[in-house]
């Protein structure tokens, strides 16, 4: 049995030029696992705490030296001599040491970086690909599937400096026969969308997640531009390719109203109908955070209205937290959960959220954050849990493409075992 002999944390940069945490876990046989914690822009109020220094003289207060010190001090002392393969024991030990509900003492960014680095070291120690080790931890050894990518090709909201309220407009190549083919379709549509926007005299600069960030007259105009790009690429909208939205509605929910910059104010029931109308006019099969995280009555209305046909995803709503997810399941709120492991802070708790969702008939979507690094762990997480869906941005920026490239490698490695289910992963 290999043992942990050293743990080292360091401050590195994420894709937005902000500091984040990287951790190395060294085993007594010389193996090193390394991992970085991502960081979000639009965040749920109940997410685990990302520990920042608050020292305005360094990185405008966004430094993470406190989190790094927690890795190099108490976390290192706690885990020295431990078995890296026993992920639950490592994660539970860190949770107990932190002893807060939201990991505010050590920082979820510190705990997560070590949790993932240990998993990577354990995978290497067993001579396993990371996705195979994750499948073992998940209790589903040897069971894999390739995820349908939800490609964010128009960015708005908190992810871009433009006038679009809805944060993400995504395409899903559900008609493809493999992940590699899905990636090609998405890339071709992405390039055709650039041409469509240019022809309209619109900006083709990209947002945090690599999608275009033009100033469009309305959210509906964004959908029309995507439809044109899909057709120009030679694909059929609704069969080859479907659409998905991330409203991030908490960002434009004020005083009990949903305020769209170009389209006015809506009550909860009115905004639920606004979204339902979009699904009637466009082949939108997934809507994330369609209502505010605190507007559970509104979520109930939306779920009853379109939940049978449309995947309704809780991100800010559930924050990868099993306690909150269980409440949602019990109340029939939404029917899907977005999985972001930095919202909860350990690999073990992330797997528990995926398992709870699947047991209740909810789908689980593995997701990046807007502040990413070259770390591609979420690709292995998606395959190793057979989650079926992944959100990792657009088709440019290496912080996004690194995940797609890792999925290509995994699909090649799995060969005939690489199942891509396409439309079967979704409701309706």
From Swiss-Prot:
GO terms for cellular component: cell surface; extracellular region; phosphopyruvate hydratase complex. Its EC number is 4.2.1.11. It catalyses: (2R)-2-phosphoglycerate = phosphoenolpyruvate + H2O. GO terms for biological process: glycolytic process. CDD domains: enolase (cd03313). The active site is at residues 209, 340. Its main location: cytoplasm. Its cofactor is Mg(2+). Keywords: Cytoplasm, Glycolysis, Lyase, Magnesium, Metal-binding, Secreted. SMART domains: Enolase_C, Enolase_N. PROSITE patterns: ENOLASE (PS00164). SUPFAM superfamilies: Enolase C-terminal domain-like, Enolase N-terminal domain-like. Mg(2+) binds at residues 246, 288, 315. Binds a second Mg(2+) ion via substrate during catalysis. It is an enzyme of class 4 (lyase). Coiled coil: none annotated. It comes from the Bacteria. (2R)-2-phosphoglycerate binds at residues 167, 340, 369-370, 391. NCBIfam families: eno (TIGR01060). Catalyzes the reversible conversion of 2-phosphoglycerate (2-PG) into phosphoenolpyruvate (PEP). It is essential for the degradation of carbohydrates via glycolysis. PANTHER family: ENOLASE. Component of the RNA degradosome, a multiprotein complex involved in RNA processing and mRNA degradation. This is Enolase 1. It comes from Pseudomonas syringae pv. tomato (strain ATCC BAA-871 / DC3000). The lineage of its organism: Bacteria, Pseudomonadati, Pseudomonadota, Gammaproteobacteria, Pseudomonadales.
């Amino acid at each position: 049995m290999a043992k942990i002999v050293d743990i080292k944390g360091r401050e590195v940069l994420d894709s937005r030029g902000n500091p984040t945490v990287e951790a190395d876990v060294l085993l007594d046989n010389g193996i090193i696992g390394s991992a970085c914690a991502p960081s979000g822009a639009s965040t749920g109020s109940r997410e685990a705490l990302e520990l920042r220094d608050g020292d305005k003289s360094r990185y405008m207060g966004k430094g993470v030296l406190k989190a790094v010190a927690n890795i190099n001090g108490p976390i290192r002392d706690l885990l020295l001599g431990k078995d890296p393969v026993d992920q639950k024991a490592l994660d539970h030990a860190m949770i107990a040491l932190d002893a807060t509900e939201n990991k505010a003492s050590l920082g979820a960014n510190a705990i997560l970086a070590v949790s993932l680095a240990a998993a990577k070291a354990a995978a290497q120690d067993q001579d396993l690909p990371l996705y195979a080790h994750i499948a073992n931890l998940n209790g589903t050894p040897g069971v894999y599937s390739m995820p349908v990518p939800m490609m964010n090709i128009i960015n708005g909201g908190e992810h871009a400096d433009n006038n679009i309220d809805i944060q993400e407009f995504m395409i899903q190549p559900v008609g493809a026969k493999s992940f590699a083919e899905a990636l090609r379709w998405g890339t071709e549509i992405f390039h055709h969308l650039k041409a469509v926007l240019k022809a309209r005299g619109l900006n083709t600069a990209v947002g945090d997640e690599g999608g275009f960030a033009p100033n469009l007259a309305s959210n509906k105009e964004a959908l029309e531009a995507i439809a044109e790009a899909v057709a120009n690429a030679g694909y059929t909208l609704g069969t080859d390719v479907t659409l998905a939205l991330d409203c991030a509605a908490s960002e434009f929910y004020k005083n009990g109203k949903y305020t769209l910059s170009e389209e006015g104010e809506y009550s909860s029931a009115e905004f639920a109908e606004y979204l339902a109308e979009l699904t009637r006019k466009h082949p939108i099969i997934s809507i994330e955070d369609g209502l505010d995280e605190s507007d559970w009555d509104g979520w109930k209305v939306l779920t009853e209205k379109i939940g049978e046909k449309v995947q309704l995803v809780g991100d800010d709503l559930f924050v990868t937290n099993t306690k909150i997810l269980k409440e949602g399941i019990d109340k029939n709120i939404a029917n899907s959960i977005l999985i972001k492991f930095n919202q909860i802070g350990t690999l073990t708790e992330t797997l528990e959220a995926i398992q709870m969702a699947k047991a209740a008939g909810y789908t689980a979507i593995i997701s990046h954050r807007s502040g990413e690094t070259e770390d591609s762990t979420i690709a292995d997480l998606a395959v190793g849990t057979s989650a079926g869906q992944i959100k990792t941005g657009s088709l440019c920026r290496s912080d996004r493409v690194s995940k797609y490239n890792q999925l290509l490698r995994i699909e090649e490695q799995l060969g005939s075992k690489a199942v891509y289910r396409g439309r079967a992963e979704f409701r309706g």
